[in-house]
């Protein structure tokens, strides 16, 4: 079984992986991953390119189902429910576990419709004042309301890159998820927009559990409560972020964070 640094804590576990293995065809991409994701905390996944961190992230809402030849063994649980149980509704899983991608990907619709589309589709609200209120609340939650409140009918694609990413975050929180997955959400953004998104993440963890993949170790150190280091599909070490960066227990972790490989 994969060795990793485990935490002893009475924190509430929101999601967990147990003996998780994943293959793309004949290639094994994840090896015996065991990890607890804590509620209303930010967990950063770090490691060199191809280490498995984004693959693991996508296991948490079954996005890997969309990849041909993908096979998963082991458990991934959210609130104690195995999300890979054949009886589980995958759409319901993805409603509870939202996703924000590396490149901002607003729908080719108005700002308003970007937010309203999924809640209307899932019958969370009806058209009218309730929907208007949800759109406003979601945009406020993503720190975007004041910038767009007078142009809600404008295309979401007309916004700046940083605004588009916040629109995607607003779209994700509009369906009231419990977990938000972020796959390198600032890698395509300028430093000012990056800082805005980082500040937003810290605010959002008051309501949501956040798991973020990042190549930026400084970003992990700034925003994450916990950090997991992946290498060659294995979870090498997982602990409080400060411990990972100040006093890592594994030599491979120390080598990575000091730039000796990566």
Curated annotation (Swiss-Prot):
Task: Name the reaction it catalyses.
Answer: phosphate(out) + ATP + H2O = ADP + 2 phosphate(in) + H(+)
How the protein sits in the membrane? Peripheral membrane protein
InterPro entries referenced in this protein's UniProt entry, alphabetically: AAA+_ATPase, ABC_transporter-like_ATP-bd, ABC_transporter-like_CS, P-loop_NTPase, PstB-like
List ligand-binding residues for ATP. 47-54
Q: Which superkingdom does the taxonomy of this entry point to?
A: Bacteria
**Key word Cell inner membrane present:** yes
Say which enzyme class the record assigns: translocase
Locate the ABC transporter domain: which residues?
Answer: 15-257
Q: Name one GO molecular function term.
A: ATPase-coupled phosphate ion transmembrane transporter activity
Q: Name one Pfam family in it.
A: ABC_tran
The answer to keyword Nucleotide-binding applying to this record is: yes
Q: Which GO terms describe its biological process?
A: phosphate ion transmembrane transport
The cellular location(s) given in this protein's UniProt record come to: Cell inner membrane
Spell out the family assignment given in the record's similarity comment.
Belongs to the ABC transporter superfamily. Phosphate importer (TC 3.A.1.7) family.
Task: Tell me the subunit arrangement.
Answer: The complex is composed of two ATP-binding proteins (PstB), two transmembrane proteins (PstC and PstA) and a solute-binding protein (PstS).
Q: What is this protein called?
A: Phosphate import ATP-binding protein PstB
Species, as recorded: Wolinella succinogenes (strain ATCC 29543 / DSM 1740 / CCUG 13145 / JCM 31913 / LMG 7466 / NCTC 11488 / FDC 602W) (Vibrio succinogenes)
Task: Give the gene name.
Answer: pstB
């Amino acid at each position: 079984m994969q060795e990793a640094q485990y935490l002893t804590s009475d924190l509430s576990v929101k999601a967990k992986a147990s003996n998780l293995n994943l293959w793309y065809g004949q290639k094994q991409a994840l090896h015996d991953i065991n990890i607890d994701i804590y509620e209303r905390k930010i967990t950063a996944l770090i490691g060199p390119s191809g280490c498995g961190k984004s693959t693991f992230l996508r296991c948490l809402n079954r996005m890997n189902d969309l990849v041909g030849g993908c096979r998963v063994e082991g458990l991934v649980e959210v609130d104690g429910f195995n999300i890979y149980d054949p009886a589980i509704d995958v759409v319901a899983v993805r409603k509870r576990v939202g996703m924000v991608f590396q490149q901002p990907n607003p729908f080719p619709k108005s700002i308003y419709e970007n937010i309203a589309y999924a809640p209307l589709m899932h019958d969370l609200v009806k058209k009218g004042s309730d929907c208007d209120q949800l759109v406003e609340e979601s945009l406020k939650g993503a720190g975007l309301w004041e910038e767009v409140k007078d142009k809600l009918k404008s295309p979401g694609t007309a916004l700046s890159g940083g605004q588009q990413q916040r629109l995607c975050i607003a779209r994700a929180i509009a369906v009231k998820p419990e977990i938000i997955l972020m796959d390198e959400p600032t890698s395509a953004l300028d430093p000012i927009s990056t800082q805005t998104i980082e500040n937003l993440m810290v605010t959002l963890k008051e309501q949501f559990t956040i798991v973020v993949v990042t190549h930026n170790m400084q970003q992990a150190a700034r925003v994450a409560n916990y950090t997991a280091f992946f290498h060659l599909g294995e979870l090498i070490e997982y602990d409080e972020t400060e411990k990972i960066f100040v006093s890592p227990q594994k030599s491979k972790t120390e080598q990575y964070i000091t730039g000796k490989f990566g």
